[in-house]
Structure formats: structure tokens, C-alpha cells
């Protein structure tokens, strides 16, 4: 509780339909779990969130803002990393651009890349680190071959199952327009209260889709409102209802991310290959049906007026999978493209996050995760950053002390 990041429980009394959700979940074998991040994850419970007094506790707010005044910290906004500066097999800096101005930052100790699962492998490839055939295809001279760069991409793939609710005031939709929205805005501005200061996903179910599993392998995240897509925007619907985000927790479908050009501004080729693994197809079908079972159980079934999506006519495996492929979305949890491990042939960084075969270079972001976490990647990424900083500082102290560590 003394760290920089505040973690809070979603207040149970502030979530519409919660008590009905708990009662229905218990009837289908999912007990109320007061701590989904505790000893056991299974059941229905409230989200634990990085929100305090209605404000999201981002890394910028918790870590960067307090450090902005330090003399040993320089922040370059609007900078685009172009490539790493390599001297042989040692990384000594980063080439970057601010607007049209090319610049270079030199390191006296180490370079730590934290560009994320999409851009970290791309930056390595632009620097000549990766699969030789990928690099040569772009006209980049290979400096160091690491075949796992850009491979092993995984993500949480989520169809949205939607239900219309007949009871007035039972969802956030009623408070998202007119004078009620004005009231919510005032509550948020004065006290950080109301639904504007809450997570959009206050309720979660974790469960096993098949016998023999040690831990839950699927989740249904419940949004107590309906929303609509208008172009690239999401807007709360005028219609009253709930949305269920369905996820297979540890996806086995593997994709890739690779540079497409020597131009650092060019987007990479991202191939998720969602649902390519049979286990993922089976898991998402079971999870959709679990969500439907919940909503068809008292006391929820009495207030459900309609299944909006995928709809009551979509029932068979093939029909459901076709609907998922056309409607599911990423949850923006990509991992694994610079995966950690001891084998340079199948991984990119070692257990201390050092890039295999390149001195002075570490990676600290979700790309180093060997597989997906059974939840959001936000907190794990903060842990990776803290651990990487600790290891880099320890290595520096060892070097200065002259002590040999074996």
C-alpha cells in the first residue's frame, strides 16, 4: 500500500444489477469471489482497478509526473525512434526524430527499449536484429540473427454479447443523456463520483470451460450499459442494456509483427491469426454459452427483453464462430513478440531482459511475456518496468564494484 500506484475495489453498492448478477451466477455454479486477484480467481466478483477518486492511475500520473523535475531526466515529446545505434554487437544509443529533425541519444551504460509489442520488434528489425530473410527482404543488412523477433504474437480476442434490459434505471444508459448526464458530470467534477469515475467493466466472471483445468481459462467482463459504434467512435446507446466482453484468457493462437519498410513511420504488418488454434475456438464458444446461461437464469431472465447480439437465431458452432470472426475485437493486450527465455533460437531476451547476443540492450514491455496473462496486461507491464530498472541498476552496481558474479 506504500507504492506509487493506487489500486481500489469497485464499490459494490454502485453497480447496477450486481446483486441479481451474483444470485444468477451462484445458481450456475459460480460463487461470489470478494477478491478476484486472491488465492482463487474463479467466480463472480468486482473489478480491482487502478482508479482513485475517479482518476485513472496511469504510469504517467504515478511514475512520470513526480519525476519530471529530476536533473537526470530528459523527456522528448513527439519523438519517433528510427533505429538503434550499434557498434558491432553492442548497443550504444538510439537514433530518433522530432518532426523532420534527426537526432541521436548516446548511452554510457545501457539502452532500454519500451516500445510495446508492436513497435519493439519493428525497432529491432530496423536496426538489423531479427530474421535474416525478413531483413534482407527490406534491404536491411542483418547484424544479428534472432529468429523469434516479431513472432509469438498473442492477444485477447473479444466478441461482445449484448442484451436489452427492460427495467428503468438498471443500467448506465439511463444516466448517459439529458439532465441525468449533467448530474453525473457534476458528481464527477466535485467528488470524482458517479459512473464517469468508474471503470467501464465493474463486474467479471472467471470460469473453466472444460474439466481438468487447474485454473479458469475464460472470462466474461460485464459492462452495465449498451454502446454503439459510429465510425471509429464508441457511443453509449439510448437503448437500455448490458454488454458482455467474452475472452479466452490464455490464447494459443499465434501471430506475428514485422516491419514492412525501412521507413520508421511505416506501419508494420500485424497478423494476429485469431482463432487459428482449436482450443481458442472451443473456449470462445463455451464462454459465449456461459454468458447466455447467466442471462437466462433468475433473477436476470425476468428483466432481459432481448438478446441483441449475436441474437437468438445464432446457435450452432459454425454460426457462432462466423459471428465472432465478423464482430469480435482486440482488447489491446498484445504480448510475446520479443519473448523471454533462455534459448536464443526461440526467444529474444534472457531472464534479465537482455537481448540475446547484443550487449547493452534490454527490452521492458509486454513483448517480453512468453504467454498471455489471465487478465489485463496493464499492471504486469508496470511490474516489468520496475523489475527491469532494478536489474539494470544492480548490474551497474556490480560493474562499479568490480565484483565478479557467477
What annotation goes with each model-predicted range?
Residues 1-91, 97, 160-183:
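Conserved redox-cofactor binding core of oxidoreductases
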Residues 33, 74-76, 141-145, 221:
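General small-molecule cofactor/ligand-binding pocket signal
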Residues 47-52, 76-87, 218-234, 238-245, ...:
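A glycine-rich dinucleotide-binding beta-alpha-beta segment and adjacent secondary-structure elements
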Residues 83-184, 194-195, 249:
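Glycine-rich loop(s) and the adjacent beta-strand/alpha-helix scaffold that form part
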Residues 140-161, 301-315, 393-406:
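Active-site-proximal substrate-binding core of FAD-dependent oxidoreductases
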Residues 141-143, 206-214, 279-303, 317-326:
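Flavin-binding catalytic cores
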Residues 162-285, 322, 330-336, 346, ...:
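FAD cofactor-binding and catalytic pocket of flavoenzymes
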Residues 371-392:
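A conserved FAD-binding loop/helix module that cradles the flavin
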Amino acid at each position: 500500500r506504500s507504492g506509487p500506484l493506487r489500486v481500489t475495489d469497485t464499490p459494490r453498492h454502485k453497480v447496477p444489477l450486481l446483486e441479481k448478477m451474483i444470485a444468477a451466477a451462484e445458481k450456475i455454479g459460480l460463487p461470489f469471489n470478494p477478491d478476484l486477484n486472491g488465492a482463487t480467481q474463479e467466480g463472480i466478483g468486482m473489478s480491482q482497478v487502478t482508479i482513485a477518486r475517479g482518476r485513472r492511475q496511469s504510469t504517467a500520473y504515478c511514475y512520470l509526473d513526480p519525476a519530471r523535475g529530476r536533473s537526470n531526466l530528459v523527456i522528448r515529446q513527439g519523438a519517433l525512434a528510427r533505429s538503434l545505434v550499434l557498434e558491432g554487437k553492442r548497443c550504444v544509443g538510439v537514433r530518433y526524430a522530432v518532426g523532420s529533425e534527426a537526432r541521436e541519444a548516446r548511452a554510457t551504460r545501457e539502452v532500454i527499449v519500451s516500445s510495446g509489442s508492436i513497435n519493439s520488434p519493428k525497432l529491432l528489425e530496423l536496426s538489423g536484429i531479427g530474421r535474416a530473410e525478413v531483413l534482407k527482404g527490406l534491404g536491411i543488412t542483418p547484424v544479428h540473427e534472432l529468429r523469434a523477433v516479431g513472432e509469438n504474437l498473442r492477444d485477447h480476442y473479444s466478441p461482445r454479447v449484448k442484451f436489452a434490459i427492460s427495467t428503468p434505471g438498471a443500467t448506465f444508459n439511463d444516466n448517459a443523456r439529458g439532465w441525468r448526464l449533467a448530474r453525473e458530470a457534476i458528481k464527477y467534477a466535485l467528488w470524482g463520483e458517479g459512473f464517469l469515475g468508474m471503470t467501464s467493466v465493474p463486474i467479471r466472471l472467471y470460469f473453466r470451460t472444460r474439466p481438468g483445468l487447474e485454473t479458469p481459462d475464460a472470462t466474461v467482463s460485464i459492462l452495465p450499459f449498451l454502446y454503439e459504434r459510429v465510425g471509429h467512435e464508441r457511443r453509449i446507446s439510448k437503448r437500455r442494456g448490458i454488454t458482455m466482453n467474452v475472452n479466452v484468457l490464455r490464447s494459443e493462437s499465434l501471430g506475428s509483427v514485422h516491419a514492412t519498410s525501412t521507413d520508421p513511420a511505416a506501419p508494420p504488418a500485424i497478423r494476429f491469426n485469431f482463432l487459428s488454434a482449436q482450443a481458442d475456438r472451443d473456449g470462445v464458444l463455451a464462454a459465449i454459452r456461459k454468458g447466455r446461461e447467466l442471462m437466462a437464469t433468475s433473477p436476470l431472465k425476468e428483466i432481459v427483453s432481448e438478446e441483441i447480439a449475436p441474437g437468438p437465431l445464432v446457435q450452432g458452432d459454425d454460426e457462432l464462430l462466423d459471428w465472432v470472426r465478423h464482430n469480435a475485437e482486440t482488447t489491446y493486450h498484445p504480448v510475446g513478440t520479443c519473448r523471454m527465455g533462455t534459448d536464443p533460437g526461440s526467444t529474444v531476451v534472457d531472464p534479465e531482459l537482455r537481448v540475446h547476443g547484443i550487449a547493452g540492450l534490454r527490452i521492458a514491455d509486454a513483448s517480453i511475456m512468453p504467454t498471455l496473462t489471465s487478465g489485463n496486461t496493464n499492471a504486469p507491464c508496470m511490474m516489468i518496468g520496475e523489475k527491469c530498472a532494478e536489474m539494470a541498476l544492480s548490474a551497474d552496481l556490480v560493474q562499479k564494484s568490480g565484483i565478479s558474479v557467477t
